[in-house]
Amino acid sequence: MFNTILVPVDGSEGAKKALSVACLLANQADATLHILHIPEELSHETTLVWGIGAIAIEASRSEREGIGQQVVEKAAEAAREQGITKIETIIGHGDPARTIVSEAKKRGVEAIVLGSRGLSDLKGFVVGSVSHKVGHAATCSVITVR
C-alpha cells in the first residue's frame, strides 16, 4: 500500500500508538519507516514512554536533543521488534507541523502516521493541533491515530 511512511514521535502515548499503526502498514509492503522527532520546549515537566523518564521544563536545547535521540532510538527498537527492517531516524528542528510536512516532502513519503495528541496537548487547544495542521498541509496521505 505505502512504500515510505513517516511517523513523528515525541515520547507520548499517542506517538507510541501511531508507531504501532505505522509498523502494521509498513509490514504490509516492506516499506521504509522514517521516524522523526522534533525537540520542543515544553510548558510543563513531562514523562516519556519507553522508559526514558521525564523532561524538565528548564532542559536546554542540547538536553532536549539528547532525549530526542533516545526517543527515536527506542521507537526504532520497537519498530524492529514489530518486524520492520528499513528504518531511518531523523531529528528535526522548528515548528513541528511545518517540519513534519517538509521532511515528508524531502523524503518522498507516501503516508504520515501521527497521534492526534502529543506532549504539548494543552497548547493544541489554543493554537490548533499539529495533527490538524499536518492534515491540511501535507500532499501525501495522513493517518491520525487516537
Model-derived regions, located:
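Structural beta-alpha unit
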Residues: 73-112
